[in-house]
């Protein structure tokens, strides 16, 4: 199951299927549609290690790396974790480039400097040039990302985390 969803649902699916002697893996994907087509996505897999081992050949065809994270639901949990970093990296890059332009700096030059500095993130490679050229078209539906951010915040709240940056991110998306 490559759906980005609630880890509890993945646990429920797994329990239901396991009771019928069917293995279930929540194999969430980190990467854009283009990265998936090019085999550059990363898979984060929850479920039994035996089932993961049986499916590694399939995973190697879908992405450049696959990680067995743990039991059922852990792939879904890891996807939420990576989506926090991804969403906030994109927002931070956009804000940094806007600041560069507002301060009279060339955004393309600022991007080059940030790519060479400790501020570097792979988001700069996938979104930086697009942002500099004014192309802000999303790679995915914003409503889908907002759903993920709300799910992230629900799990953060459940764990007792304030998550102020993710709350702001949600407000921007709304």
Task: Name the predicted role of every residue range.
Residues 76, 120-174:
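Interdomain hinge/lid region at the active-site interface
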Residues 24, 109, 164-168:
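Alpha-helix N-cap and coil->helix boundary residues
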Residues 105-117:
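Small-residue-rich helix-loop
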Residues 4-87:
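Rossmann-fold dinucleotide-binding core
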Residues 10, 52, 59, 78-81, ...:
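A general structural signal for well-ordered alpha-helical segments in protein cores
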Residues 2, 27, 40-41, 61-65, ...:
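N-terminal glycine-rich phosphate-binding loop for ADP-containing cofactors
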């Amino acid at each position: 199951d490559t759906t980005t969803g609630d880890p509890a649902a993945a646990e429920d699916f797994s329990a239901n299927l396991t009771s019928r002697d069917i293995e279930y893996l929540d194999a969430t994907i980190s990467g854009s549609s283009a990265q998936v087509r090019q085999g550059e996505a990363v898979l984060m897999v929850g479920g039994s290690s035996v089932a993961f081992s049986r499916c590694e050949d399939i995973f190697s065809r879908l992405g450049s790396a696959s990680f067995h994270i743990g039991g059922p639901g852990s792939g879904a949990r890891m996807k939420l974790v990576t989506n926090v970093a991804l969403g906030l990296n994109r927002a931070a890059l956009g804000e940094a480039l806007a600041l560069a332009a507002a301060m009279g700096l060339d955004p393309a030059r600022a991007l080059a400097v940030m790519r060479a500095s400790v501020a570097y993130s792979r988001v700069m490679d996938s979104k930086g040039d697009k942002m500099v050229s004014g192309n802000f078209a999303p790679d995915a539906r914003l409503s889908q990302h907002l759903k993920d951010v709300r799910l992230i915040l629900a799990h953060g709240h459940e764990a007792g985390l304030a998550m102020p940056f993710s709350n702001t991110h949600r407000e921007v998306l709304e």
